A protein has these predicted regions:
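Accessory nucleic acid-recognition modules appended to NTPase machines
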Residues: 1-79
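Conserved catalytic cores of phosphodiester-cleaving nucleases, focusing on short active-site segments
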Residues: 49, 81-100, 111-113, 127
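Residue-level recognition of the N-termini of beta-strands and the immediately preceding loop/turn
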Residues: 63, 123-126
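Acidic/glycine-enriched edge-of-secondary-structure segments
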Residues: 65-74, 93-106
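Active-site-adjacent loop/helix micro-motif of nuclease/hydrolase catalytic cores
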Residues: 100-112, 137-138
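Arginine/glycine-rich "motif VI" loop of SF2 helicases in the C-terminal RecA-like domain
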Residues: 113-124
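Domain-level recognition of nuclease-like catalytic cores that cleave nucleotide substrates
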Residues: 128-160
Length: 160
């Protein structure tokens, strides 16, 4: 709530106070809303992982969690991983998607490719995908056959 307030309301308070609420929505909030919600969703996903970690309900008991971005030495391109947690030897990599479409297998493949940056420092890898709108059948099938993949949809997030 504070993020929304300071990002949109505080920055536009004069316009709002003078009756331009609709214009503020149309020109200032609406064009940026999905970007904003993506960041909020990432925070909710991190809170979910922290709660599960505290209960020992994840495949690792991590000691640190955060976001990572940097240069992939293999591709020389910039990479970003929404959530990365580790316990010193095992890693959990997470991708958070606030989209209206189901999360596709390409997101999982991309996450695994980005996680290769950490291949020298890890013993085991786990992958968690968070999706507002669920998962395609290909992702569901992959998760059924691979215990290192965790899927969390909006319904699961609402119940934790």
């Amino acid at each position: 709530m504070f993020r929304f307030w300071y990002r949109y309301v505080f920055a536009n308070r004069t316009l709002i106070e003078t009756g331009a609420q609709q214009a503020v929505w149309e020109r200032r909030i609406k064009p940026d809303y999905y970007s904003y919600m993506g960041l909020v969703f990432e925070k909710v996903c991190m809170d979910y992982l922290n709660a599960k970690n505290a209960k020992g309900e994840l495949p690792i008991l991590y000691t640190s969690i955060g976001r990572w971005w940097g240069t992939n030495a293999a591709t020389h391109g910039q990479e970003e991983i929404d959530l990365i947690a580790n316990d010193g030897k095992d890693y959990l990599f997470g991708e958070c998607k606030w989209r209206n479409e189901k999360l596709d297998i390409s997101v999982l493949k991309d996450l695994k490719a980005k996680a290769d940056v950490f291949s020298m420092n890890r013993k085991n890898s786990y992958y968690v995908l968070f999706s507002k709108s669920g998962f395609t059948e290909a992702v569901l099938n992959e998760a059924r056959s691979d215990d290192s993949i965790l899927l969390v949809d909006l319904a699961e997030l609402m119940n934790f």
